[in-house]
């Protein structure tokens, strides 16, 4: 499923959760009523939560939530989630990579082992085959360790999240 489809579905879920009168649009009043219901009639907490959510989503402060405003909120939320999970996901990526490419089982990849990763995807990463060492091999020992791989995968995930957020939704 592509990113725009996911964002569209998130927006639809948002509208379904907060559009209590089912008129197809979400206003700050809809948000307030939804929170009031979820907070068992606690006016103070509902007002507070509404204020926080509205100040986060309603960028033009008109009391209404456009598709673009809700989609931007969903993209930013997804970016934060990716960033929070980047460390754990990177470790899983590293484990999978080591299982497949660490032929001598020394828990690090030689230049040859590392380049197999890229060849398996149909390309060589750089015109200068040693350039990966300059980028990933932080301790300059000629091999890529678990920690170096984890940092590399983590950075790739965070860069991806940043790119998604910067590009934003197609409105």
Curated annotation (Swiss-Prot):
It comes from the Eukaryota. SMART domains: EFh. Ca(2+) 2 binds at residues 102, 104, 106, 108, 113. Ca(2+) 1 binds at residues 19, 21, 23, 25, 30. SUPFAM superfamilies: EF-hand (SSF47473). InterPro entries: EF-hand-dom_pair, EF_Hand_1_Ca_BS, EF_hand_dom. Pfam families: EF-hand_5, EF-hand_7. Keywords: Calcium, Metal-binding, Repeat. One of its GO terms (molecular function) is calcium ion binding. Ca(2+) 3 binds at residues 137, 139, 141, 143, 148. Residues 6-41, 57-80, 89-124, 130-159 form the EF-hand domain. This is Calcium-binding protein F-like. It comes from Dictyostelium discoideum.
